[in-house]
């Protein structure tokens, strides 16, 4: 199959040289216009119909396979981020986190396989890795967004699945001064789940656009401020072991009620100067600051996985325990507080210089930086330290939605029996017990990228080729990840929170920490729990001890990447058999240098020490590409693309860090199997190479008057060098033996168990992904003038993938983020100022990334979901209120929960999160 793909790619590349064509004078506007700062056709937005028409024009004129949305779509949908609107495009899906669409999958490939550009430039992210979290960008700032699904030699930093290009407004594209202000109020359909949370929010924005000096100088300014509340009824199951009868039974549960408040403030400015046809300069800046506060309160119930827990009154259905009474349960009350601060800034300066009538020089420089700090505070309370207090007896019953109702028998609001403590004695610092009455994580991430690009574009006459282009791009990226964590214990004595040093095992609940009303968990059957102010406890009651466990000390790392990209491209513009033909052939040469500095744990004299370590590597890739578009019949296009693309691994996989582990429990078990060796290590791999993909794309597109079209496209990707995150290699740890006590050393030598496993990601995977997409954008006036104003935009896709890892070559797995079936549809009416629309999107089950233990990324199967949004509005057409529009919107009207499960068994629900409906009422005034 791989040889077939390369053969097709080579044939397509050679096609341009063997065609007999007639040259035409027109020049093709290609995807690299984003980098030159010269947009294609100006978009004039007067409503959803104009927006869809301009998106259709963009799709029609491009030789690439591309889908677009315009400012009207982003500005009028009930969006929290741009991802809401992008999720309506064919083959694009969004994963909800904390009730917001944050992460995109394109053609079944998750956020790690796509890239995001701002005005054609690669961007950093506030996330842990490369995938952009789209709520870092205020959506009001963008004129249009293009999703390129096929590659072009001039499209720098393209992804395997696709490339999202966020396009800011260009003031010289507008003919008049524009001043617009908008204010929108928000209400969540659920009541406040925490008394110190918020239910109501707002969103405000202002835009100013003007032209000066005979329309040679343009200025655009934008400001945005928002406070977005959300509620979340959360349920988390620990897992489902088997009981003595072989039935699956819930191991434990962690239900919460959560209240979030996202505050975001942003500003954007664009200065554009074009004094002549031979010089065009654009400088733009975007800055965004957001803070998110989360208040979480709940109770952890150790059930069958608890210590000495009794199980009785069991009901079983098809090998699954649907109800049971658990005795000797010691619940852990949680009063948690999370705060995230993130700042993003992006600067870009583009200059296009006409050297003569046939030659242009483009020079582009940019810098982007993102900084994020997290404050993740947990506090615990219960009836006594190490199960010394009053035990609980709870009844757990599985509900029809997959949740377990949990009905306790003790009063969790009674401060006479509840204290600040470590109820189950879980605290352990790697060598001795600690009184863990809380825990604090304080990670910090800084992502910085600088880039410089220069390219020449020259016209060609009398040939199939209309122009040539050569250029180069240099980028330097550096991402720093720093982690700090602390045990929290009752104050009053001891050192380092250890039990042996005399740390108090509990502390009474201070009255100052009590909030006015207690939180209810009645959606699960818990009437109420003790509701405390965790910040008061942190500031006044609890001591902090640095978490110096080996696994915690080897997390800090820096990853640097220097990437040099050179490219050459020929643009095709002619005829084939009397049919209009456009296209391009080209190649990229990419040289990469990557380096990482971090820490590695070492074992010497029975003590684990942490040592600095660094590493580096370099490599070169060649990426050819070709695409053609033939207009076989008027307004009927066939587009074919073939390309080799790549995308770099996750940044945390490129880190050099390694954590050494020594498991005393495996000493003397009599096995030489490396899986049961006392020695192991886990970390990153600085020698990782990018994922590679050989792509074939085909699209059939028919366009109609008035902006309508239908299209069907298919794609095939042959994936190689796929990163296996679970790769293990056998390693001889015998060099460590002299540091061990003699008795342990002798047993290990006798068993031959000194060969252990080193877990490190490697490029040992391969696979394929293929699919088909269908789209219809139909204004109903095509069928009858009486239907003027009505229309639909609908799309659907089917995607299939098979990935084989070197660590498990016999079993194929699905890709993270891939839903086999995806569909979306919007029905709208817009006429004479009145507009209404209903949008629905569906995705089948997929492997989603969620936050696991200590906020570590974890993959679980997410259930299929369908989201319904709607809006209605009116814009005054004349009179004193002309320019004023009113909009009422609703989001997630189906109140669709986010649900994950494990082991391909929907009964084994792990996460259940219900966010409720959101309602918005807004005013916009333009003058």
Each language-model region and where it sits:
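Transmembrane beta-barrel wall of Gram-negative outer-membrane proteins
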Residues: 196-308, 314, 324, 339-361, ...
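Short loop/turn motifs that connect adjacent beta-strands in outer-membrane beta-barrel proteins
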Residues: 155, 171-177, 213-217, 278, ...
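Short acidic/polar hinge/loop motifs at secondary-structure boundaries
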Residues: 121-149, 199
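N-terminal periplasmic "start-of-domain" segments of outer-membrane beta-barrel proteins
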Residues: 44-77, 103, 111-114, 121
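Extracytoplasmic beta-strand/coil segments of soluble accessory domains associated
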Residues: 83-122, 149
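Outer-membrane beta-barrel signature, preferentially recognizing the C-terminal barrel domain
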Residues: 333-344, 555-561, 646-719, 752-771, ...
